[in-house]
Amino acid sequence: MDFISYFKHIELTEDDHLPMLPMGRARSSEALKTMKSPRESAVGIHCFPCAAGKLSIFLIQRSEYQGKHSGQIAFPGGKMEADDPDLIYTARRECYEEVGISMHEGEYIRSLSPVYIPVSNFKMTPYFFYHETQPITIHNEREVQQIIPLSLESLAHQLPIEH
């Protein structure tokens, strides 16, 4: 079974992301119960094969501005707009706006558990997409300072990230 097939079918719980939360941040499931009207948002995790058949994803570094997410390393994404039919659409639209990945590129694989982002009161849902080849990207300089390709192997083995 390849990674994508495995990932499609693995059982995930609501709090599987907890080990990655910053120290002191409340569990998302608990925080969401106490928050009033968190804003829906979505990010796209675009996975693709790179050198030697290894899988990679993109991160972005947000541009510097007078906002709460200035300069952050993140997945491309943002808030749901009133005319977005659903959050998958939001993830695709935001990825197109920020890094130029066409809204029709990438096979939708699955969503991951929503995470509460306290600084902006976002309930953020990650959506995972697979591409047969590395997608062509063009970053929106107003929103994105740089696009950072990252091999999944470097995450698994905690290797230094080169960009």
Predicted segments with their positions:
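N-terminal leader/linker segments that precede catalytic domains of diphosphate-processing enzymes
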Residues: 1-74, 79-135
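NUDIX/MutT-family hydrolases
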Residues: 139-163
